[in-house]
Amino acid sequence: MKASQFFISTLKEAPADAEIVSHQLMMRAGLIKKLGAGIYNYMPMGLRVIRKVEAIVREEMNRAGAIEMSMPVIQPAELWQETGRFEAMGPELLRIKDRHGRDFVVQPTSEEVVTDVMRQDIRSYKQLPKNLYQIQTKFRDERRPRFGLMRGREFIMKDAYSFDRDQTAAKVSYQNMAEAYRRIFDRFGLTYRAVAADSGAIGGDLSEEFQVIAATGEDAIVYCPTSDYAANMEKAEALAPAGPRPEASQALAKTPTPGKATCADVAALLGIPLKTTVKSLVLATDLTNEAGEVVKTQVWLLLLRGDHDMNEIKVGKVPGLDASFRFASLAEIDDHFGCEPGYLGPLSLKKPVKLVVDREVAVMADWVCGANEADFHITGVNWSRDLPEPDLIADIRNVVAGDPSPDGKGLLAIERGIEVGHVFYLGTKYSRAMNATFLGENGKPQFLEMGCYGIGITRLPAAAIEQNHDERGIIWPDAIAPFTVVICPITPERFPDVKAAADKLYSELLGAGVDVILDDRGERPGAMFADWELIGVPHRVTIGDRGLKEGHIEYQHRRDTAASKVEAAAAFDFLKGKLAL
């Protein structure tokens, strides 16, 4: 490719709405152009990166035995209604009507469609296993799209779906896909972690995220440096507290705490460690009738250590609670506690509530909580003596750095990550809902065992940039760079030898199958170098008249701060070595 024939559009400054480095650099390098909120044109330079990502993903999926297909972007609502996701997915699912008033959705994933395909065609266990995948445009109506391709509304995703005869075979398929994902991300040259995760709206009971490590990542990744344990914050656990609860050593006392409505303020006032305080969080669940009217409300009180935060995913799995819980209203809090938030506690309630105690609080003694009276707290609270032993104890908190790892092999650490892939074992969640069965060896109908596996094709380049950039621009890994080599001749219009040497090297690299671009735009050297450093092509060759007269050209890797001299006659062989050709 010659630069004069290509579409190169770089910017000196990033748009004002570009918040993170990848968004700024993708806009400045001309990889993407914004069309609307969370919707972007993939410009030629950016599309080359995306196509390389797709090619690697496609190669490894095919190698793993998956079969490519393509499913419609617009899907009938009836299929989504069969699984209940038409209502359950909420406003993120874009719903549309055709001219006849029929409901459709714009796909965010395709579990329903692929399950419908399989229930029509799979009749016998002899046809299994099967793994179908597509690389396709998706749409999710994000409330607040941001960070460019990191959290857009329209995006490209690789989604795969495995179908097996039983759980054992399904988990083999799951591991096969997880291994394929490791090969994919290894080929991209990215630093990543595979972490245990919650299945969320997809469903299922076995799930892992593949997280690219980056300081700007939206997700907190929890891991143990001295073991293999890793999970995202939603899923992460600490080792359960061990040993007997300490004996009570303080008397129960009502203590003035004027204007101190947080655990941190109370601890500072009383001169005690924050971890000896207990925070009270009040939730509510509503029972509704068929008309959607609330017929009964249950109020819940959650107790957590003052230095810990509630984990909503874990709370949603507490017996009796589910993901539909909400925070109680001020009126509901006053009705049950007779007090404003900030001074709440489990003692002296006006009305009974259901109590959920974090397992750390369950082993505490002499703790401090609200007195259910403004400007007062209770000190010296103890189980059994002041409160009945808790009936419902659960892990409902986020872990913190320094917690003991649940495998007992060290302490937990936390870093930030960008989710670029996710694998789920679904079981029969979708096949059962859609009655997708096959005849087993015993001749009886059985539900298909499923897994699903996603990779964010358009998110991956953004994640790669977050991990690979400097003050000059992007530093692409070779595998997904828009071009692998750029040749920069200096004023070739004035020096025929420079043009001839550049053309010769260009032809040699093309003949060797190298993705090379020759910058023949006639730009000044400074502007030319600035463009390619911004765009991030990994290997740059500069050919100038003075160097040729001395018998050399200059080579610079994008990560290097200075160029090195290479014998002009050996330039092609030198690059073959660098590119491992």
From Swiss-Prot:
GO BP, sorted A to Z: prolyl-tRNA aminoacylation
EC numbers, comma separated: 6.1.1.15
GO-annotated cellular components: cytosol
Pfam families: HGTP_anticodon, tRNA-synt_2b, tRNA_edit
Keywords for the protein's UniProt record, in alphabetical order: Aminoacyl-tRNA synthetase, ATP-binding, Cytoplasm, Ligase, Nucleotide-binding, Protein biosynthesis
Enzyme class: ligase
GO molecular function, a single term: aminoacyl-tRNA deacylase activity
Gene3D superfamilies the UniProt entry points to: Anticodon-binding domain, Bira Bifunctional Protein, Domain 2, YbaK/aminoacyl-tRNA synthetase-associated domain
Similarity comment text for this entry: Belongs to the class-II aminoacyl-tRNA synthetase family. ProS type 1 subfamily.
Listed NCBIfam families: PRK09194.1 (NF006625), proS_fam_II (TIGR00409)
HAMAP family, A to Z: Pro_tRNA_synth_type1 (MF_01569)
Free-text note on domains in this protein's UniProt record: Consists of three domains: the N-terminal catalytic domain, the editing domain and the C-terminal anticodon-binding domain.
Oligomeric and partner information: Homodimer.
Function in brief: Catalyzes the attachment of proline to tRNA(Pro) in a two-step reaction: proline is first activated by ATP to form Pro-AMP and then transferred to the acceptor end of tRNA(Pro). As ProRS can inadvertently accommodate and process non-cognate amino acids such as alanine and cysteine, to avoid such errors it has two additional distinct editing activities against alanine. One activity is designated as 'pretransfer' editing and involves the tRNA(Pro)-independent hydrolysis of activated Ala-AMP.
Protein name: Proline--tRNA ligase
Source organism of the structure: Polaromonas naphthalenivorans (strain CJ2)
